[in-house]
Amino acid sequence: MIDPDGYRPNVGIVLMRRDGQVFWGRRVRRDGWQFPQGGMHSDETPVEAMYRELNEEIGLLPEHVQLVGATPGWLRYRLPSQAVRCNRSQMCIGQKQVWFLLQLIGDESHVQLDQSENPEFDHWRWVSFWYPIEHVVMFKRGVYARALCQLASLAQQVVGLEVGTMPQYVQDICLLNVGYKHLPNWVSRY
């Protein structure tokens, strides 16, 4: 399913522990690490797709998490030219994503990376809230920065402490990838 602009609808998942650390998974047979994410089926809402992807990629069920919130709209990123692909005469140039913030309320022993025939991850760990922005593959850094910036106030409310000061590189990525000349007020709070 690709929209008329060439973007594939997708959901991204930021799974957070009670201490504010977030799930970070290493992709199978690759060096890259990322958050869980996946495409939506044509008959799914973003929330339904998120719960399906949560189970397929990391083995968690709805009762293992609390849905804290989501980005208010679609966040887009373009694929590098070598990754652009056609699907039945439609060209997919990137992904548009709704990002969800979930709090793990179950035991982390419920995390199982082998829930599907084609696992997405082969290893995982907990990292600080802002860490993924600098360590995800380059073409996703902008969308990660926008997603985490939009979810940071929700994360802070849930864990009851600062998710940490937004590092300068995150501010730079926001400026470069969103086109701001100055950081908006909602960014300067962090």
UniProtKB/Swiss-Prot annotation:
<dbReference type="InterPro" id="IPR020084">
    <property type="entry name" value="NUDIX_hydrolase_CS"/>
</dbReference>
<protein>
    <recommendedName>
        <fullName>RNA pyrophosphohydrolase</fullName>
        <ecNumber>3.6.1.-</ecNumber>
    </recommendedName>
</protein>
<dbReference type="Pfam" id="PF00293">
    <property type="entry name" value="NUDIX"/>
</dbReference>
<keyword id="KW-0378">Hydrolase</keyword>
<comment type="similarity">
    <text>Belongs to the Nudix hydrolase family. RppH subfamily.</text>
</comment>
<dbReference type="GO" id="GO:0016462">
    <property type="term" value="F:pyrophosphatase activity"/>
</dbReference>
<dbReference type="InterPro" id="IPR015797">
    <property type="entry name" value="NUDIX_hydrolase-like_dom_sf"/>
</dbReference>
<dbReference type="InterPro" id="IPR000086">
    <property type="entry name" value="NUDIX_hydrolase_dom"/>
</dbReference>
<feature type="domain" description="Nudix hydrolase">
    <location>
        <begin position="6"/>
        <end position="149"/>
    </location>
</feature>
<comment type="function">
    <text>Accelerates the degradation of transcripts by removing pyrophosphate from the 5'-end of triphosphorylated RNA, leading to a more labile monophosphorylated state that can stimulate subsequent ribonuclease cleavage.</text>
</comment>
<feature type="short sequence motif" description="Nudix box">
    <location>
        <begin position="38"/>
        <end position="59"/>
    </location>
</feature>
<dbReference type="InterPro" id="IPR022927">
    <property type="entry name" value="RppH"/>
</dbReference>
